[in-house]
Curated annotation (Swiss-Prot):
Subcellular location: Secreted
Keyword flag Transcription: no
Name of the protein described by the UniProt record: C-C motif chemokine 5
Species in which this protein is naturally found: Mus musculus
Signal peptide residue numbers: 1-23
CDD domains: Chemokine_CC
Annotated disulfide bonds: 33-57, 34-73
UniProt xrefs under PROSITE patterns: SMALL_CYTOKINES_CC
Free-text tissue specificity from the UniProt record: T-cell and macrophage specific.
Length: 91
């Protein structure tokens, strides 16, 4: 499936804006918190792993780590996020 340059630009811009923030600059908990979610699904081939944000964060989120080690926040209630998690667990 081909992705147009405009769609790819939108996805990458959204990913840059939805990167996780550190939970606490001074605490020992290094799990980031997310304040916004990615609006469109990432290409699954770009995702290599995931983790959940800390329970100390105000928003529950899934953080996907891309092949280029970028961290992107996603809404754990979205169907595509759940499908990606299942895929990563099976591989």
């Amino acid at each position: 499936m081909k992705i147009s340059a405009a769609a790819l630009t939108i996805i990458l811009t959204a990913a840059a804006l939805c990167t996780p923030a550190p939970a606490s600059p001074y605490g020992s908990d290094t799990t980031p918190c997310c304040f916004a979610y990615l609006s469109l699904a990432l290409p699954r081939a770009h995702v290599k792993e995931y983790f959940y944000t800390s329970s100390k964060c105000s928003n529950l989120a899934v953080v996907f780590v891309t092949r280029r080690n970028r961290q992107v926040c996603a809404n754990p209630e979205k169907k595509w996020v759940q499908e990606y998690i299942n895929y990563l667990e099976m591989s």
